[in-house]
């Protein structure tokens, strides 16, 4: 095996969202600006409100990007990354299934490392035999938090 990567923390319990988000604030990580990435359904149905409500209670400044479509394109991720660049978050919260989480991860790479050729990076991950690409160090500008709303994709624990 060339490498193994797992999230630093995994909260797995009904109702743990509030506790997990509260750790982003002064209690543990002292983050102040959250960029929430989700899809139109979760945003318009009000499901994203639970995340933004907790962020509001904490006094954390936040903005939302909800233009993620199923099987998001690189153009979608670039649009989100441009908004990130303007907003300057110190935490990115991906809420949804595989599409919002994958789009948010790409946005995160583009935000942290705008010099990276994403097409080259992605192609190296397509063929398991060629996974020798040195992934850029992440987390200098923002930490990444995934809140899965579906079971099955595993996007919350994979790089792409």
Residue ranges and their predicted role:
Residues 1-91:
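ATP/NTP phosphate-donor binding region
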Residues 75-160:
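Glycine/threonine-rich beta-strand-loop-alpha-helix active-site module
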